[in-house]
Amino acid sequence: MKTYSQLKDTAQTRKDKKMTENAKKMLAEIQYPALQGTQDEVELAEKIRKAFIDYYMKKIDSHKAESYVDDQKKYASRCKKEARDVAEMKATIENFDEAALWIRYTGKQCFVERYSWDTVAQKEIDWKFFDLGDHIADYVQDGMSKEKVKKELRAIGML
């Protein structure tokens, strides 16, 4: 016969699993706008998108193992926040497709070429690349020309 503590642990495990599944489902349902560009550009943008989603999926899984997420409410809100972060990222970088194409344009495919997606999803993330994407997205929203963007990126040491 199981003790109260064992039964409680079993119930907790079921709740953890369900919440992780729900968070992943939310991630999977995020709708992205259709991509435009050459086939190479579209493939690159898709790879970048996939890397973001894979990274967040892994991040959700890893939270279960982290000791500071003992409180179930914190864990639940954390999972929801991760899914929300991806949705917000998609919203703030509506121009991320364009940013990805510009990364290709400026020859900054090193991220795609140097890192396997498994490595990216685990921990070896090239944050400089993500910063570059953010900077480009900001510049695109400000309506800068490609030449001006390249000049700005060189000035801050991104190119």
Question: What residue ranges belong to the model's regions?
Answer:
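Charged, low-complexity intrinsically disordered segments and flexible loops
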Residues: 1-159
